[in-house]
């Protein structure tokens, strides 16, 4: 039972990572369909450059340029866990167990605009810079069940201490009987959670053509974050005893844990860029500074208390016909008092720590890391364009709650390459690849919020409707690697359990966009 409060932590942090993303830990880089079909756009000159290569946009023709993009994304997350206490779940006594979450974002819009005049380009961009959907875990997570399973063991241990004290004065064992907690740590519970994250980004930039070959840009992005987290763990039963009966038997929901938290915050990202083109080559770079972001909580959370545990155990004794004096003698036993006192102290301390991050009115650190993008483009002939790119995200210096970023080995590194070919005057086909490598340590991995390194492959094309309009279509799939970890849990001073976890994801994105020149 001293572990019960930690379920609250699990609920409250399950959706700390991005829902739908291509990029770093908190950065979406799939902001135009051209990326979805080619993967490498850092050195391309086009309307998508408003995000990928803002300095290069100034080399487009004079006039107005507009891009309208729509994406649909579906992602699954799965964690296989072989924790040894899971067979005690009377409703699902299987190990290893796979816990699965699903995220579906049917509409992810983005818009880019540029007006070029002379040596100047004035640009704007609206997109989801982070998040982008809702993720559901219909049956909870392994960390949830792990804590409930340990709660069941703790309840049985306390029951044993109480019954041992009762036996010393001739009373029969009550709480370790199979009609109450039993001795095996059997349990059941219901759990659900969902989370939603949207980081809206609106940027403005200016690019200037220094020479016919060199351009620079400067801009700023405003970010507004809005998040919602809801989850619960309820109907916890240990053996045949509903847990609420020893916490507050007058309220069936007294053992339930519920999180309902809305978060919002805003920040600003300065952005600079440079582009240099010579002959068949183009070189470009962009740097986004760190975004300081503080999320303010608006929460209505419900958590259990075990402050009345002794009184409720006493009431159970008396209701079973035990004289008040005998019940008082059992519960005043030094071992029983010590066990309940330690239980309450651990519970209250950990519950305070758990509530801290999602306390109503509190502001939580959630910085978006600095981001460097470098690209090279080469055009061997007019009909063929080849791009390669590199990304670096400074994740270790983007402050998050409890300085979790310090557990990373390094920031995220990405490499990409893409090619597009004009097969006819009306049709362009393209494909691309991107490798994403996170600086993950074993300590950083957590089924409540995780990423794993991956390779993404894209295909798509452009239909040139006329000289003013181009239709982009794309699909990309992300092949995630598996991250395996091992952990040892100390249940008691003399008992420990080791278990393994296997983390992975699956991601599919479809996209359609229209580029307009006028």
Each language-model region and where it sits:
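N-terminal, post-signal peptide beta-strand-biased segments of exported outer-membrane/organellar beta-barrel
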Residues: 17-137, 143, 149-150, 156, ...
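Residues that define the transmembrane beta-barrel architecture of outer-membrane proteins
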Residues: 48, 104-109, 198-202, 264-270, ...
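Repeated loop/turn-to-beta-strand initiation elements of outer-membrane beta-barrel proteins
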Residues: 64, 119-122, 213-216, 280-283, ...
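Detector for outer-membrane/organellar transmembrane beta-barrel domains
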Residues: 273-295, 332-348, 352-439
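Outer-membrane beta-barrel "beta-signal"
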Residues: 461-463, 504-518
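Solvent-exposed loop segments that connect transmembrane elements
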Residues: 84-94, 140-190, 226-261, 295-360, ...
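Transmembrane beta-barrel strands of outer-membrane/channel proteins
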Residues: 68-74, 124-128, 218-222, 285-289, ...
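Residue-level signature of outer-membrane beta-barrel architecture
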Residues: 58, 115-117, 208, 222, ...
């Amino acid at each position: 039972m001293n572990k019960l409060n930690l379920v609250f932590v699990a609920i409250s942090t399950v959706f700390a990572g991005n829902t739908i993303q291509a990029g770093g830990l908190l950065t979406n880089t799939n902001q135009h369909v051209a990326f979805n079909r080619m993967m490498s756009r850092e050195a391309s000159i086009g309307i998508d450059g408003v995000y990928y290569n803002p300095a290069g946009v100034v080399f487009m023709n004079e006039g107005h340029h507009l891009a309208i993009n729509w994406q649909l994304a579906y992602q699954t997350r799965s964690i296989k866990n072989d924790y040894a206490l899971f067979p005690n779940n009377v409703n699902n006594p299987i190990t290893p167990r796979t816990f699965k979450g699903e995220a579906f974002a049917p509409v992810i819009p983005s818009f880019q605009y540029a007006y070029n005049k002379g040596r100047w380009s004035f640009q704007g961009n609206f997109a989801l810079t982070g998040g982008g959907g809702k993720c559901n875990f219909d049956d909870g997570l392994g960390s949830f069940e792990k804590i409930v399973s340990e709660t069941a063991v703790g309840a049985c241990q306390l029951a044993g201490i109480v019954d041992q004290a009762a036996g010393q004065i001739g009373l029969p064992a009550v709480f370790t009987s199979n009609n109450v907690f039993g001795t095996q740590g059997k349990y059941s519970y219901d759990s659900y959670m969902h989370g939603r994250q949207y980081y809206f980004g609106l940027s403005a930039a200016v690019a200037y053509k220094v020479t016919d070959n060199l351009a620079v840009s400067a801009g700023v992005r405003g970010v507004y974050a809005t998040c919602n987290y809801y989850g619960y763990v309820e109907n916890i039963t240990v053996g045949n005893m509903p847990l609420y009966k020893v916490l507050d038997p007058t309220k069936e929901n007294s053992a339930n844990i519920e999180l309902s938290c809305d978060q919002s915050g805003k920040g600003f990202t300065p952005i600079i860029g440079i582009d240099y083109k010579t002959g068949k080559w183009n070189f470009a770079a962009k740097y986004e500074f760190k975004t300081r972001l503080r999320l303010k909580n608006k929460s209505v959370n419900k958590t259990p208390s075990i402050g009345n545990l002794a009184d409720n155990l006493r009431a159970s004794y008396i209701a079973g016909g035990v004289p008040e004096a005998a019940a008082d003698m059992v519960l005043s036993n030094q071992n029983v008092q010590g066990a309940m006192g330690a239980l309450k102290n651990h519970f209250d301390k950990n519950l305070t720590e758990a509530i801290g991050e999602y306390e109503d009115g509190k502001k939580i650190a959630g910085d978006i890391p600095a981001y460097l993008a470098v690209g090279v483009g080469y055009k061997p002939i007019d009909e063929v364009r080849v791009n390669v790119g590199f990304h670096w995200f400074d994740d270790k210096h983007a402050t998050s709650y409890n300085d979790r970023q310090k557990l990373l080995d390094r920031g995220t590194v990405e490499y990409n390459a893409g090619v597009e070919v004009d097969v006819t005057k009306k049709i362009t086909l393209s494909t691309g690849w991107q490798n994403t490598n996170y600086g993950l340590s074993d300590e950083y991995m957590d089924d409540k919020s995780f990423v794993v390194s991956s390779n993404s492959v894209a295909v798509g094309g452009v239909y040139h409707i006329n000289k003013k309009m181009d239709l982009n279509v794309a699909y990309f799939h992300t092949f995630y690697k598996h991250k395996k970890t091992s952990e040892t849990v100390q249940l008691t001073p003399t008992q420990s359990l080791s278990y393994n976890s296997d983390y992975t994801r699956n991601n599919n994105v479809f996209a359609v966009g229209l580029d307009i020149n006028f």
